[in-house]
């Protein structure tokens, strides 16, 4: 029975002479994609509705003729009815397949249609390729080579349109480059409910514009730059910074909040130039928020810690790593377990949290917790939990309510019960433990990436690494285990945090430590139930669910509803 049902849901479609089976209701452009037949397009995007206004996806379409009573239908060698081809092309993005349908993407008619569309698009398009940020990833550039005529017949004066227009705090518009695909208009209206973009004027004078009283300022505005097929919309942050073909792309995850959006980090010569969303239909679809996109700037802070230091008088002195590790462990070892507290961060990777737990066991630390940081979330992707690995901290450190012990630690420091404190990855002065309280400590060790107010109080400073400077794993708000990958090296003498924690443990127990992060994950997986039988490589680029949190992603729920309604492909 299941096989029969599946067969009912499938239809036979011929694409460029080859028969394939596709799901009933599939759009022609997606059927061609399954058949590995490219159909060029500008306005079509699987996450948005299809207006069919660019006409670049025109293909030749045919259907079997309807037989007259008693007439025998002629069939081909495969047993399928012969196809009668329509004299006019159809758009592949907005039409769905039917049983016996034929599609030609490489016929003379289809090729002539594409050439004609390309010629119209290029009539008034400026020759900006040498200075355009989209060069190298511009579909107009690519299609003009693959589907264009090769020369222009246009001799008249090109229409001039507005250039370098500020339409929002993060975006510039060049109307001369716009091909009127309306992707940005539909994204703003359909995905983030911010209907501020539209077209005005007519014919060749048609231009994209923003509402006069409301700029494009929502927290997802830079997604319009990603989906713009040309260089009409550019990011102020990336504009004129680097050519795309010089950059290396690293698959990773955003650590700006607990959502864990999948991203591509684009870097060159140990510098990050941009972050863009990477599609994952279980986490962030194909989008990400602007604040997460700009999160990489936290790694460029002028007050970045680059060398280990110890306190000397009123200041700090740079030392080497072996001395720093020894000073930290000797200082902590002077106190009993009940006199030691450890505060970690829910921004640490699972591997780092595992080593922090090992360290706390070795020191017999009386109290261990992580800082809880909450802010504003929204009904799309941004999560109110502003730390990416709270679920990892719960599972590995066995915390029921992360952050609940911070006030207890503060009180016990004031009372003189806690005399030594190790703070990893957080500035606790901003999160509940004030400077006056810290003055009661006998010994303070901190590891951070920035020279903040906490570092000024510390006896030993251990410069760590940012999220793009290390490899590891995290568990997001919905319980999905994902991999964080290293895109650049930590600056100066700063090191990956798991290596620092390894050295602290080795200094205390004298045991040989693991040298590879993958081996560390395997050791952790043997001790953490939710990670059993997992390896770092088995997680893959899209992650795997390991915890049932009951949370859902609002944007994905809305997207699923639109897919069911047939509005988008998804």
Map each language-model feature to its residues.
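Short beta-alpha connecting loops at secondary-structure transitions
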Residues: 13-14, 99-105, 208-212, 462-465, ...
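Fe-S ferredoxin-like electron-transfer domains
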Residues: 3, 55-255, 259-263, 268-272
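Short, structural beta-strand-to-alpha-helix junction motif
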Residues: 26-30, 349, 496
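A basic, amphipathic helix-loop patch mediating RNA/tRNA/ribosome contacts
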Residues: 28-61
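Eukaryote-biased recognition of intrinsically disordered, low-complexity regulatory segments
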Residues: 6-16
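Short, contiguous acidic and Ser/Thr-rich linear segments
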Residues: 19-26
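N-terminal leader/propeptide and maturation segments of large enzyme subunits in energy/redox metabolism
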Residues: 127-158, 488-546
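Catalytic alpha/large subunits of respiratory electron-transfer oxidoreductases
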Residues: 122, 126, 174, 181, ...
